[in-house]
Amino acid sequence: LHDALPISDEKVTKIANSFINEIHSPDIITLIEVQDDNGSVNDGTTSGVKSGEKLAARIKELGGKNYKYTEVAPLDGQDGGKPGSNIRVAFLYNPDRVKLVEKEAGKSDEAASFSSGHLLKNPARIDPTNPAFTKVRKSLAAEFEFKGQHVVVIANHLKSKLGDDAVYGSNQPAVQHTQAARIEEAKILNNFVQEGLRQNPNLNFVLTGDFNDFEFSETAKAIAGDELINLMQEHDAADRYSYFYRGSNQSLDNIFISKNLAGKAIFAPVHINASFMEEHGRASDHDPVVVQLDFSNQTNQPD
């Protein structure tokens, strides 16, 4: 999901319906640009729990799954976006299918870390005080358990491309003025994955969200490193898009998986938003990207 909450009841219904009828109720949903509970009112409110729970309740009302919401709220005014909105990434998850590993959640300025191959705090933000994330949404790591297997899902919304040249604009070659900042964020993410795999080589990782860069970019390469597979990069080239901007289809939304999940993933962008206008019923300006993972032959992991 890529949009700002809280939003009108009509918009909430559109989003909820798309989750139920278009992407068929995934076990875990990454949410992007969730606003705090009073939207753009700049009064110091940072929690977005009511915003997330409003969406979860609407999904249930419409006959969908009974999702739970989890987040770590940002510090006031520190994560970019519209002043007062305090946008953040977060998760919905279906507790009938997956378990959020029960631990104390990290604090807004507390860096996620591993202990004995599992998240020490859950969920937790990745290196939130690092200068690379100044005025940018911090990535959120959450560890889930599915049939005895553990997977760390990392939600991301990297630095905006605002100020970059259009890919097919008048200025050629196009200059990506903001990419250097995203590459630094990407290195932080890859280092985090490396540490998790160093402690627990069987740990599964899935990185999702709006990376604000293309599947072939240096940002994507830095995230993947030698540890991850970029599923969008391996997808049919004609179908590699989740966003439409200035006349071109683009794949800003990607999914990376750890190599121990290679051959066990079915991936697809679901084109229900980017190619349509609001009057045609779209729920967001980004398409959702979806991955199905098969854990049936996974080796049991240490507790």
Which residue ranges define each predicted feature?
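Divalent cation-coordinating acidic motifs and surrounding scaffolds
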Residues: 1-301
